[in-house]
Amino acid sequence: MTLNYLLYFCTPAKISIIFKYEHITPKKWMRLVKPKKALGQHFLKDLQIAERIADTLSDYKQLPVLEIGPGMGVLTQFLLEKGHDLTVVELDIESVDYLEQNFPVLEGKILAEDFLRLDLGKLFPDQFCVIGNYPYNISSQIFFKVLDYKEHIPCCSGMIQKEVAERLAAGPGSRHTAS
């Protein structure tokens, strides 16, 4: 049975097990996996961009970090390499399975939940940072939730879709303002 045949019939979580035997990198795996539009997924594949995003937290190493939507852990790996105390929240169970198998250092810190329903005050009673490659369909809601906790979140960093950035930065009466 060829690898292509196996990949066709396996879930993404099962595919990650094949990595060990077939030497498939996460980047190659992401080419095989289709992002789920219903979850607003878009996988971060560019390692240089991921590292630049992780570098935005260099002044906050003493604070815990919450990564939203880690997917296959491209940004996660840089945050861990830089020594951050990291917790991740991921709604997609296949991505959760992948993270659990490939990032054992995150045991107990992978939350298989919806970020928008998390009680951030309970999870982080003190200050913490938020970072991510934000799902496009809830980017605005993520920022509104972060604003609700602004006393606890000194830094929120990440990548968003250009159109979302234009809406968030638009002044009153601008053509980019959300209706």
List each language-model region with its residue ranges.
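Catalytic cores of RNA-modifying enzymes
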Residues: 14-179
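Intrinsically disordered, low-complexity segments enriched in serine/proline and basic residues
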Residues: 6-7
